[in-house]
Amino acid sequence: MKSCHNFAKRQRALGLGVLGWHSLLQSKNIAFEGLEAQFLNAEIHNIIRERCDRATSKLAEEFGEPEHLRGYGKRNMTTMAIAPTTSSSFILGQVSPSIEPLNSNYFTKDLAKGKFTYKNPHLEQLLEEKGKNNTTTWKSILVKGGSVQHLDFLSEHEKDVFKTFGEISQKEIVIQAAQRQKYIDQGQSLNVMISPKCPPKQVSELLIFGWEQGVKSFYYQRSANPSQELARSILNCSSCEG
């Protein structure tokens, strides 16, 4: 405990992060894959970075600089980190966890007090507008593992907006992580979803690509949902084409 106390006292390290990234994109009708999402990603983390710098400088003026930061005009050694936020996201409005895409648009979750059924609220709103918010539609989504790619009344853009984790190019996820990393002074909880059938060479290439782009580390490598149609290749990405 003494070492923990000394660390906190001398460095005042913090780790401000984000949650609900995929939910935010869906609320704005923006597909996860593409330049529009990348522009918003950069804008958000640039603003957070600027405000963190401003806040830690102000705190240093009010409360002084800790031992390891004397002469730097800052109160905190670190200020930003991307945590998993799985529980926090569920509590704070059932939004998508952290920077991660939603694994499914419709699922049942076992909790201590019983089972909870999650329906993507942004998808539900869209289905309501189209007159398709009914049991038949949701049952078909459930059968497909939470995917909407089979719904013929949705446009291609709408299908892109509501792609699930395994349907999104994993390279796109890594590109966004690399893009925001330059604003973050610590690491990111960066997960990727890869089919067991994916060639090891592709997995290796994805990890090396992340390292080359400046990603500090990966977190979990998850197995893809077999009920969903997977992305053509983990190395493909919409923003890289054309």
Predicted regions and their residues:
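Catalytic alpha/beta core of large soluble enzyme barrels
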Residues: 80-231, 235-242
